[in-house]
Amino acid sequence: MEGSEAAQQKDSVKVVVNIRPLITPELLLGCTDCVTVTPGEPQVQIGPHVFTYDHVFGSTGSPSSLIFEQCVHPLIDSLFRGYNATVLAYGQTGSGKTYTMGTNYTGEANCGGIIPQVMETIFKKADALKDGTEFLIRVSFIEIFKEEVFDLLDASHAALRLDSGSVAKATAPARVPIQIRETGNGGITLAGVTEAEVKTKEEMASFLARGSSSRATGSTNMNSQSSRSHAIFTISMDQKKTSSASDKLSNDDYDILSSKFHLVDLAGSERAKRTGADGLRLKEGIHINRGLLALGNVISALGDEKKRKEGAFVPYRDSKLTRLLQDSLGGNSKTAMIACISPADSNAEETINTLKYANRARNIQNKAVVWSFSLKINRDPVTAEMQKLRSQLEQLQTELLFSRSGSAALEELQLLQQKVSLLELKNSELNHELKERELSYEQLAQSALAAQLEKDQLMLKIESARNGKSWDDIENTDTDQDVEVMKRYILKIQQLESELTRQKFSSTCKNDLHDRFAMDKDLLLDDLGSGCEVGTPDASSAVNFRITPVPAGEADEEKERDHSSMQDKLDKELQELDKRLQQKEAEMKEFAKSDTSVLKQHYEKKLNEMEQEKKALQKEIEELRHALTNITSSTDESAQKLKENYLQKLNTLESQVSELKKKQEAQQQLIRQKQRSDEAAKRLQEDIHRIKSQKVQLQQKIKQESEQFRSWKAAREKEVLQLKKEGRRNEYEMHKLLALNQRQKMVLQRKTEEAAMATKRLKESLEAKKSTRDTYGSASGSGIQALMRAIDDELEVTVRAYELRSHYERQMQERAAISKEIAKLKECPQAMSPSARSSRISALENMLSSSSSAMVSMASQLSEAEERERAFNGKGRWNHVRSLPDAKNTMNYLFQLASSSRCQQLDKEVMCKEKEHLICDLKEKVVALNGRIRQLETQVKDLNNQNMLLFTAISEAKNPVGTSRKGTVGSEDGQHYAMRKSIRASHSLHYSKNSFLWSDDMDISDSEKSEGSDADWEASDADYGASDADWECSKKVRRRRQTVSSHLNPNPGSGTTQKSAKSEMASQEKSTSLDLAPQCCSCSKYSSCKTQKCECRASGSHCGGDCGCITSRCSNRVDMKEEKEGGGVVEVSSSDDVDDAKVQEIVKEGVMLLENSMSEKEAQETKSRKPLADIGNGVVKQTGAKPKQRKNWRKSTVQLVPSAPPLPPTAPQNTEPVPRNRDIPLRLPRAMSSPAVDSIPLTDRNAAKPDESMSSNKENVTAVRARSPARPRKNANEKENHLR
């Protein structure tokens, strides 16, 4: 191992944050980016929370494409060094975990993700190292679905699939869950999981795609392809070094390394309310959240340094997910955690929780070690060094022991150790040499076989040539079949010979035979006798006889073991060979007969020839001898010469005869050898038959013995099992008794300790009570008040959290409505003027930005509230209750709170019913007023036509009489008086109609509105829409002007002459201002009308009584004295008559009733609420914070003022004012209140929806939305644009 690795001991979990971009649904809802990344630093900020991690990708940080290079690639290097590695993706649903990991791989080249890059990198490194290392790579793919582990690569079972993202159907047969097992060294393994061996990247990718298609997915409101299970893709790799034996002996490194790479894609945490899950989806989400909760508990337990040092319990077994990730979290693995988050402000709460869990995971310490397959142990560098030191210590201890006893034993031990090492080295060398000799033997056997075949082929050709065949016929003869037959026979003979030789001799004996034969050749010749030669069969048989008793030694034992191991294989081979031998024996005999007959004929023919030649030579010799005897009797010289010649010839013939004898002997010897070979072949066949019969007998005997042994073994095993069972029972009883005894001892000890502790607690409680009485006083003193304050604080926190949650959800809904309105304004630009539309869009965008910041802050508070609730849930909430009186006081106070809340609920229900009756009465009045409006609409149309004619007549009359107006004033008074009266009547009707239109805006009945009123309202609205800058002021002044004119408008139905005269005089005075200013301005009461923004000044006329400005400030008005001089003096009373006063009183009472019914519920006087962070749960004595006055928001009201009714309205019978709400000292959580009470204000019900048309928005212009306390106060322009 390298030095850096040896120095490495513990490694923290690397935490990476990946921020995905905003997706289309979030952009349509108007979501904004609420996550901020510090430039150049791995730091994330969301609201008031700031987190620091190892790496941050996405948003303004590093690009997400660098996750693999910076975080995952170092883990692959560690994988090749023998360490386990894990990459897991964590986050809420829809945050991009599956996309980041690449689990949804389909085989396409453009599919991104970490897993495809891991596969490519692993095979690239394996190809680069394949010269010195052999790799075995396997993959497995599992999922945890509903807390059950399933194999995604199991081809025998159909995977669970989802159709159309909603209905889950399983094809038969059903999947079988995989069991989790624990190994002896504490590791986790899966029983029966499929581990497929892969050679290339394409094979691994195909398994990944197959498993991904089988994974359980579903559709929710937050994600159309939501993963419904946790998936773990595991890559197992074994490495084996291919160096030489000497290198292995000198190198102390591991020969086989085994490592695993876990790629985990977790299912996202989800809220059922946001995902809209129900039925099966809800159950799946519950299981997902349960597993993630267990994972969070494990991360919290491992991330707490104090608990880790104390060795606190880690709940790995709470979930199968945490049990499978046991090595990855705090175990034998190098781990990287990728926290995937969404930057949308609508997911701010889930994002904060994810970042908190990721921050805790940074504190987890893993201890990764190398797994050595040959040693079957984890090899940690530190542990290996300790083991080495221990061995040295043991050696030194043994040396010390031997030194005390004497030095001879130590020296002998060292010598023995050296001998053992030398023998082991020699044994390895001999084994290596044996393998080389076996290879050379196989090569020589193959060459001998080829030579034998070639020799036999040549013999056949020679025999054919001797029989008289021509060379062409011999070449054309198809000898391939004969050669094949011969080859098979030779191979079979060699196999049988080798089998016989293997049974008799061993390879070591043969080597010793050759060595001894070379060394003691003379000694063997002396033993065999002078008549036997070395190469004869007798000599060979003698040699065999002498060498047979030589012991085989260790080689014999090895061969016997090899034979016993190979005997089973040979049995099957021999059974097949028996059939083939029976078929080939006939052919072998025929071939042998044909060969022997040819040789026999050849040798007999040769013998006959030699016999004839021998007879001829003997006859000639006899003749020569006879002639020689005759010659010896004569003494002639010629006879002497002839005798010499005959002797010479006789010697020659005798030498020829001796040569022929030798040849005859040689031929006879060959014949004898042939006979011996035939006899050997017969003996060989007999041996084959005998071996076969012995084999059958042995097989039967083995079978019988095996059956007997099996029955005996079964009986013995049964007996042993019974004995073991009885022993286990006895052992169980013994352990039970021991455990019982131990428990009794422990109980006794615990009872003693409990008694001591109870005595101690009793003393402490008595002292605490005494100190409490001294501190808090009596039972009705400040102690009970402290308990009540603590309970009030707890209830306040709960109510505050509930309000935050509901306000958060309402804020999301309002923002969605604003986003839709912005989209509608952008899609339909012709609905408004460009400047108004741009101002409206900018105002809505400002509202979106403020809403986003408010949502982020609320999400932060909700996250803190949930953490506090988890921390104080259970016993922690009641730690301040230390005695029975405290508990009684607490219960009494809670009972009082519950009873008072019920009574308040009943009071509220009664008040709601009363207000509902009032609303019904007001609705009836509104219906009656709408009927009056319909009657007056026909009169308005006629009077509008008359007004147009009167305006034209007045304008024509002004031009010719401009210079002579002073002289003709008196004659034209009557005509002007009549015209002014008509104009005033038309305007009074027009304003009364408008006031009724305002009241009709609150009509929630089913009565229809006339088309004429809508048209008139649109026309009047168009007159005031000329100036976009003064749009807000015109609306407000118009509403105020209409109310004032309605109050001042005379009642034509009164029936008195005096009122008619006063009405005519008022209309005459107003007509003068109308002559001067036919178009009324919409300036505010603080305006001086000095600029062209005033419509009256812009049109060249003067402001009148119907304008929004006031006389004391306006500079565009004519002096009242000039009016009196030019138009006559008309007294106008500043107050109305008695009948008008009665009508106004009745109208005010109706308006008061309507305001009380439409206004929001009055704020109850509750105790001042504190922030969530300031409310503690453990301290009882803390005093409450200073009361903080709640902000009183201005309420928008609508006044309903009828003008010119056909009949004088009668006052309602019930004129008593609506009773005010009583002061209630305590407000319970909204979750405890009755759901039947409708707390939505009436103005919110009648408010215009964003999706309605522009005309309905204009009609409902007076509907004002109730403001939220968290929303900042808008300016007048934003409010007016929102009302539209």
UniProtKB/Swiss-Prot annotation:
PROSITE patterns: KINESIN_MOTOR_1, KINESIN_MOTOR_2. Keywords: ATP-binding, Cell wall biogenesis/degradation, Coiled coil, Microtubule, Motor protein, Nucleotide-binding. Gene3D superfamilies: Kinesin motor domain (3.40.850.10). It comes from the Eukaryota. ATP binds at G91, Q92, T93, G94, S95, G96, K97, T98. Residues 1040-1070, 1158-1284 are annotated as: Disordered. Homodimer. Composed of an N-terminal domain which is responsible for the motor activity of kinesin (it hydrolyzes ATP and binds microtubule) and a central to C-terminal alpha-helical coiled coil domain that mediates the heavy chain dimerization. This is Kinesin-like protein KIN-4C. It comes from Oryza sativa subsp. japonica. The lineage of its organism: Eukaryota, Viridiplantae, Streptophyta, Embryophyta, Tracheophyta.
